[in-house]
Amino acid sequence: MDKTQPHPLFKLATELGPLLVFFFVNAKFNLFAATGAFMVAIVAAMIASYVVTRHIPIMAIVTGVIVLVFGTLTLVLHDETFIKVKPTIIYGLFAAILGGGLLFGRSFIAVMFDQMFNLTPQGWRILTLRWALFFAGMAVLNEIVWRTQSTDFWVNFKVFGVTPITMIFAIAQMPLTKRYHLEPVSLEASEADAGDVRKG
């Protein structure tokens, strides 16, 4: 099925919208109300993404499932630890997937980024390693913040800290993607070879 490319503002809204809902509901009520609202917003964002583009990015699916699982545990057990450790699980999982993929000669970052660009095998290797280390670092950082700071501080960090950090890191990878950019011979070849680090 063909994928419709969404408007950048729509993509931004589906990614940041749930986080803003989480922040404002927590500020108005409490973390448990914010968790419930966050779960609803995540599902709404995925539905909107599918309606508009007929496609849901794999990262959004994985994140959504983990949010629903840990959000449910938070509400049922009335224990905010689960929603706080959720980012650690997500970052750790992404780091493990990327690192494990490299061991088998694959760069799953191509799938995670929805094949936004085409790189040489060396480019995929470097980019994958960088993102694996980034996700591992973010997992550690989340653990430090939620274990040593207040709930409100953690929420602010999650909404206004993580997003800028991720954007800055992603922008910092642009020289790498330009240096190792590869023009595909065909769309089929591009999709077949995307993320294959065994060549070259």
UniProtKB/Swiss-Prot annotation:
Alphabetical list of InterPro entries matching this protein: YciB
Superkingdom of origin organism: Bacteria
Location (main, coarse): membrane
Disulfide bonds, paired cysteine numbers: none
One Pfam family of this chain: IspA
Alphabetical UniProt keywords: Cell inner membrane, Cell membrane, Membrane, Transmembrane, Transmembrane helix
Protein topology in the membrane: Multi-pass membrane protein
One GO CC annotation: plasma membrane
UniProt keyword Electron transport, yes or no: no
Compartments in which it is found: Cell inner membrane
Transmembrane segments: 7-27, 32-52, 56-76, 93-113, 126-146, 153-173
Function: Plays a role in cell envelope biogenesis, maintenance of cell envelope integrity and membrane homeostasis.
Family: Belongs to the YciB family.
Name of the protein in its database record: Inner membrane-spanning protein YciB
UniProt organism field: Bradyrhizobium diazoefficiens (strain JCM 10833 / BCRC 13528 / IAM 13628 / NBRC 14792 / USDA 110)
Lineage: Bacteria, Pseudomonadati, Pseudomonadota, Alphaproteobacteria, Hyphomicrobiales
